UniProtKB/Swiss-Prot annotation:
Pfam entry (one): Ribosomal_L14
Full protein name: Large ribosomal subunit protein uL14
PROSITE patterns: RIBOSOMAL_L14
Naturally occurring in which organism (per UniProt): Shouchella clausii (strain KSM-K16)
One biological process term in Gene Ontology: translation
Lineage, broadest ranks: Bacteria, Bacillati, Bacillota, Bacilli, Bacillales
NCBIfam families recorded: rplN_bact
Amino acid sequence: MIQQESRLKVADNSGAREVLCIKVLGGSGRKIANIGDVIVCSVKEATPGGVVKKGDVVKAVIVRSKSGVRRNDGSYIKFDENAAVIVRDDKSPRGTRIFGPVARELRDNQFMKIVSLAPEVL
């Protein structure tokens, strides 16, 4: 569960290392986001020479969450960290590589490019 002021690791090579959640998209009073949801973030830490810079406001999709998500068969999938991938408005990633595993729930939300770039889909 990601909410405002949550800090997430960035799991791509867009140049950002860490982002801070500003807003959860999808409804006027929505408070929390989970895997597959799009959030608005501010870049808090970035590598020099990257596509995004520190202080940029970007959209990101959550790919890993500590709280995890329940699947239809009753199982839960949880990760060791909260991580996101920076995306454009058309849901395509800004980076060209994805680091670490991503959840299968991204396929249901039409983030196929992220799923295809990921080294492992759990």
